[in-house]
């Protein structure tokens, strides 16, 4: 009896264990079959075949909208989505599907922030049992943003433009700089597909439409939508928002303003003035720089302009700035005025007093006067003081390099010789004093020579040694002179400056003068 009882109890315990194992395996098979029939995946990262059919978007405030693209379940099923916060334990929000959509409204204390993170699961009942599927283990609301469309869109027509204004939710006002808008406007009778668009409107709640953008005389419509602006690349990931455009706002109608005629200033368009000024500067600028900075161009254009530097050079290099001495050294010959032409013999003296002496000096070899040449022909025609031409003209006038003109008043004249030189002819020949009476031409000749002589000229008593002298010979012939035609006059003068004496002597007018004068300076 004892042995049979033990065997019976062993079979009973084994049967109970087997039944428990069979029940566990049967329950597992039922769950697997149910999940396969419903098509819901329970894979950990939301990679199941049906998890991607859910799309949940947030308005970034307190609302989350979800859409399910799977076929609807039977009438007896009531699916829902459960949002479980990964940061606040126990924080769950249920979104019941109505057809293929559902909306969950969060409580005011659970307003969405960029750091929010949720786990989404799908729940439904099957044969009296609740079935659970994992949709998204880490749902970030800031990555799925679809804002509400702008509200209260209004228009304000003014002269030449139209101003559009709109409003946003007060909860989004702190994020105004992160909002980007797009405007669409068209004529009222046109379709929205033909509307004009203006985008990249960031951080503002108003916009201006110019009159030239609209068709005058037509009624236009405008509407607006918004999305989160694309931030720079240097923004941290926790503050970056992504999403899609909101729905279009309600359109607003307005009358297009009239276009105003272009205001043209009296001088024309500003662009034309700018072009004219630019061309003027391009033409005058290089020319100014060319003349201002190029000495070679200056020399080319101004090479024919005479310079008085050579004329005044002896004033400082020879006479040490003494203007009176310099003027005396640059004496000039006799120059009769036009009133003396054809003057009778009795009225000749006033004209002679107007005469001036022209002093000339050659650069290398002096020109010999007629009086000096006659000195070489005869012994009776030598200069006063028994000076020969060698004593008067030793080396020529080399002190001055150019011929100069000056006018010297004739005050005093002194007769020194009765020999009158002959007038110069065109062939360079010289005639004797005896043929002067047959010459019908009036003439006046003056020669100037610089040199050294040992004795002073008449009237010069300031120096007994060798002094520099400038001899001037002047002879004039006039038809109908007095009988003393052979008498000549010598101009003797003396100029003195520190370290240097200059004497003037020469042959002057014949004895038509009523008196003899000597002029010393």
UniProtKB/Swiss-Prot annotation:
GO cellular component: external side of plasma membrane; extracellular space; plasma membrane
Protein name, entry field: Interleukin-9 receptor
Role this protein plays: Plays an important role in the immune response against parasites by acting as a receptor of IL9.
Domain Fibronectin type-III: 149-259
Assembly and interaction partners: Interacts with IL9.
Location in the cell: Cell membrane; Secreted
Glycosylated residues, chain numbering: 117, 156
Coiled coil: none
TM segment ranges: 271-291
Keyword Zinc (UniProt): no
UniProt xrefs under PROSITE patterns: FN3, HEMATOPO_REC_S_F1
Misc. remarks from the entry: The gene coding for this protein is located in the pseudoautosomal region 2 (PAR2) of X and Y chromosomes.
Domain writeup: The WSXWS motif appears to be necessary for proper protein folding and thereby efficient intracellular transport and cell-surface receptor binding.
Lineage: superkingdom: Eukaryota
Chain positions of motif Box 1 motif: 301-309
Alphabetical GO biological process terms: cytokine-mediated signaling pathway; immunoglobulin mediated immune response; interleukin-9-mediated signaling pathway; regulation of cell population proliferation; signal transduction
Side of membrane Extracellular, spans: 41-270
Family: Belongs to the type I cytokine receptor family. Type 4 subfamily.
Secretion signal span: 1-40
InterPro entries noted in UniProt: FN3_dom, FN3_sf, Hempt_rcpt_S_F1_CS, Ig-like_fold
Cytoplasmic domain ranges by topology: 292-521
Topological category with respect to the lipid bilayer: Single-pass type I membrane protein
Major location category of this protein: membrane
One MF annotation (Gene Ontology) recorded for this entry: interleukin-9 receptor activity
PANTHER family: CYTOKINE RECEPTOR, INTERLEUKIN-9 RECEPTOR
